[in-house]
Amino acid sequence: MDNMLTFARQQQRRNVRWLLSLSLLVLLATLLSLCAGEQWIAPGDWLSSRGELFVWQIRLPRTLAVLLVGASLALSGAVMQALFENPLAEPGLLGVSNGAGVGLIAAVLLGQGQLPGWSLGLCAIAGALTITLILLRFARRHLSTSRLLLAGVALGIICSALMTWAIYFSTSFDLRQLMYWMMGGFGGVDWQQSWLMTALIPVLIWICCQSQPMNILALGETPARQLGLPLWLWRNLLVVATGWMVGVSVAMAGAIGFIGLVIPHILRLCGLTDHRVLLPGCALAGAIALLLADVVARLALASAELPIGVVTATLGAPIFIWLLLKSAR
């Protein structure tokens, strides 16, 4: 008994150290994001006229958006992996991000460019929810993890094809701009998108507080039922929350892959398996990863800005291949 108590205390201290370290790294990454750009602006110059323009009006809203979207995507990946009992589940791989893109493009086509910005965000959320609900239907049919993964990939390909057809045959300038936007990027984010940032915060906080049902869900469907968890209720709540986070993220920054897949895996490999630590850890680590990727996207080329989706795919694809090989052993 004493050994168990000692182990529990050591594990608790270790978890606290992890969360404190990740919180510190978030602060450092945020500081770097605010300073870095075509012009390096040190914190001492933030209150100058130059700092007023570049830091407070341009970089701060972008940094906040990157932070929230990174946290949302990583949390969505962790939730989907528990929800579908599939370690390879993530919004981009299972087509949820592409579903949000289809919803957005449908709104642009049907609205003839006359719809307000908030309605486009809601259409992206609806598209993400639709794909997530379809995937949940497949999961309830007790498909194997490989079949469920293939179903998600197929849905993603269908959504991608629909977007490509719509963009290719469109004469709308707005729709052609969406082709570049769907590669992922925060270049157009300013304080006008603050309502989208605000829409993410309560869902992020709520998800981070649901460690107990998430731990039970991770045990599997049968143990969860035996422990008295109302599976139908929690599945639908988590589907809505995940679809909301992915839809808002896509509406704000386009499709950004691999954050939701790689971050939860890395934290689990580091020993953070309890969702009481894994969920806030994913939010913090996802924010760090996307903040650093955004800095790379801004600074890699002197004359242009790389799509952040390209940066995350370039860094995430090798890790994804390694995870596939590791899971096949």
From Swiss-Prot:
Localization in the cell: Cell inner membrane
Pfam families per the UniProt record, alphabetical: FecCD (PF01032)
Keyword Chaperone tagged: no
Membrane topology: Multi-pass membrane protein
UniProt KW keywords: Cell inner membrane, Cell membrane, Membrane, Transmembrane, Transmembrane helix, Transport
Gene Ontology BP, a term: cobalamin transport
Chief location: membrane
Coiled coil (UniProt feature): none
Quaternary structure, from the entry: The complex is composed of two ATP-binding proteins (BtuD), two transmembrane proteins (BtuC) and a solute-binding protein (BtuF).
Name this protein carries in UniProt: Vitamin B12 import system permease protein BtuC
Encoding gene per record: btuC
